[in-house]
């Protein structure tokens, strides 16, 4: 990947993601081909925090219908990043 902003696409904004903020866990949509090491380096570079752990998962796109036409949303990749104790990502804390 080129830069941190090519790896991290957007934060996941959901109640479940907000619940992880108290434990120092932040959830992001990431590039589907990004590795855990690339995700760790991207978060550390973009938000100036120390990353302790990275968990990733693939989310399959849902099948959708528009009239008689079938379609599918794209598959995505989600990363749950845990930062060092005592640290937090200020940019995301303000979204609550």
Curated annotation (Swiss-Prot):
This is Large ribosomal subunit protein uL23. One of its GO terms (cellular component) is ribonucleoprotein complex. The keyword RNA-binding applies. One of the early assembly proteins it binds 23S rRNA. One of the proteins that surrounds the polypeptide exit tunnel on the outside of the ribosome. Forms the main docking site for trigger factor binding to the ribosome. PANTHER family: 60S RIBOSOMAL PROTEIN L23A (PTHR11620). It comes from Thermus thermophilus (strain ATCC 27634 / DSM 579 / HB8). The keyword DNA-binding does not apply. Pfam families: Ribosomal_L23 (PF00276). Belongs to the universal ribosomal protein uL23 family. One of its GO terms (molecular function) is structural constituent of ribosome. GO terms for biological process: translation. Contacts protein L29, and trigger factor when it is bound to the ribosome. Part of the 50S ribosomal subunit. Keywords: Ribonucleoprotein, Ribosomal protein, RNA-binding, rRNA-binding.
